[in-house]
Amino acid sequence: METYQNTQGSYGQRAMGGRSMDYTVDMVFCIDATGSMEDTTGSRMKVINMVKQNALNFYSDFDRIMTGKNKKVRQLRVRIVAFRDYLADGADAMMVTDFFMLPQQEREFEACINSIHADGGGDIPEDGLEALAYAIKSKWTTEGAKKRQVIVVWTDAGTHDLGFGASSEHYPKGMPTSHSELNDWWDTMDRNAKRLVLFAPDEMGWSYISQNWDNTVHIPSVAGGGLAEKGYGEILNAIANSV
């Protein structure tokens, strides 16, 4: 496991002699869409509100940070997986989109983000591992010499065991049935390209992944706090540092 503190060194391969490197970047944002993740009244902005507010500027903000690192983003695609709880939320438990090409489709991306309303969730653990499974099985680009396949998870809750919600008629077929099998899925991804950035509490599911998966950065969040303690700049920098 690579830690946040040594992320830049661990991921390495920085530009030499001031010459920028071109990157083809795919990102999947796995967003906990349960009730605690959004707040329209509190003084501290929670993560869904933050993502909504900055969706239209995400490409330009990300590109600016990458340019400062002598890294040129030749292509950026972003996919959304918004997750809740299959037993509690049924058909609304998972929203999975195709990739949005940015900045060309930034208006569609913004509309998608704005359609997410934090609601439901039932008990405190959520079906975040199923969301991660969807992300791993994305149709990643095969173009470009310098590819990055980045999964970012935002949640303030632990996870159910895989298959916890399998009795729901809406539970997807073909999901892994154990941590070991999900780990095998992760191992099939290109090790040079894959990155996992977890904004998640040090609780069920996530702690196992952060301790056992390669190319993983875990920035602990406060359980039940909606990631209100994380600023947009911190989140953006953590994502950029993983590329």
Predicted segment positions?
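Acidic, low-complexity intrinsically disordered regions
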Residues: 1-243
